[in-house]
């Protein structure tokens, strides 16, 4: 039966423990998530370049009234002592309400997405490139904070998608598990829009080039986290994209829905 409550909360770690934190991210993506389908984690690294500060956080979720003593051991003491941890048995709605209240309104945001195989060296290089380039390019932008989140994607998760009706995205399950990553930039002033968007493009491009050079990259781009200009449908296999175009042409031959829906990614334009 579905749990009436779940174990959920956010742990925060000091930047002096960054290597241990990244070890935990790797181990959960490679071993923890595939081993226990009740467990999920959202590891997010937030950096504030004007303050020369980086914060390491992990939202932990376990879908059971009974907690697992081992699945998050790499994010708890003594392996990795948090400076704060709200992980507890509670209704999911209570957790969502508490975290939603922390989100400020009125700020400007940009997103980009990346994907890679689960590799410890790749995680380190992604982290180092992101932190160093945000610091060098955006330290003078008012209110700038940036984050990168490693979202673990398991082989079983992808297989269930295939079993329920195909794999239009063409994700190569044989290479799973993956990290589908989201980069986020938040800032204050409209006058900084161009600078932040340009930096976001450059940082993402540089990380992708690094991943491709060392065969860490994965082609799929997760639309929900993508940013303006990213070629989402073009990351699908060519045959799948052609099929999607045929389906679109069959059900919207006059492009009524295609043209009336403002913005976003369009199969017709891919």
Regions found by a protein language model. Give the residues of each.
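Soluble FAD-dependent oxygen oxidases
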Residues: 1-270
């Amino acid at each position: 039966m579905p749990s009436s409550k779940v174990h959920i909360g956010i742990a925060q770690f000091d930047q002096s423990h960054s290597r241990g934190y990244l070890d935990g991210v790797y181990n959960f993506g490679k071993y923890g998530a595939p081993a226990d389908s009740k467990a999920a984690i959202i590891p997010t690294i937030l950096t504030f370049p004007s303050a020369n500060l980086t914060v390491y956080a992990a939202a932990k979720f376990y879908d059971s009234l009974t907690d697992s003593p081992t699945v998050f051991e790499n994010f708890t003491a003594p392996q990795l002592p948090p400076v704060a941890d709200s992980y507890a048995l509670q209704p999911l709605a209570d957790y969502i309400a508490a975290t939603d209240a922390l989100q400020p309104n009125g700020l400007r945001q940009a997103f980009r997405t990346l994907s890679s195989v689960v590799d410890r060296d790749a995680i380190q290089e992604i982290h180092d490139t992101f932190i160093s380039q945000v610091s060098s390019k955006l330290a003078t932008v008012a209110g700038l904070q940036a984050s990168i989140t490693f979202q673990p994607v398991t082989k079983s998760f992808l297989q269930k998608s295939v079993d329920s009706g195909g794999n239009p995205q063409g994700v190569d399950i044989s290479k799973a598990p993956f990290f589908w990553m989201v980069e986020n930039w938040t800032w204050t002033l409209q006058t900084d829009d161009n600078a932040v968007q340009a930096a976001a493009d450059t940082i993402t491009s540089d990380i992708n080039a690094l991943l491709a050079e060392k065969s860490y990259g994965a082609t799929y781009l997760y639309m929900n986290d993508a940013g303006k200009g990213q070629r989402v449908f073009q990351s699908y296999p060519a045959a799948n994209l052609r099929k999607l175009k045929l389906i679109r042409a069959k059900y919207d031959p006059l492009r009524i829905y295609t043209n009336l829906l403002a913005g976003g990614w369009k199969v017709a334009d891919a």
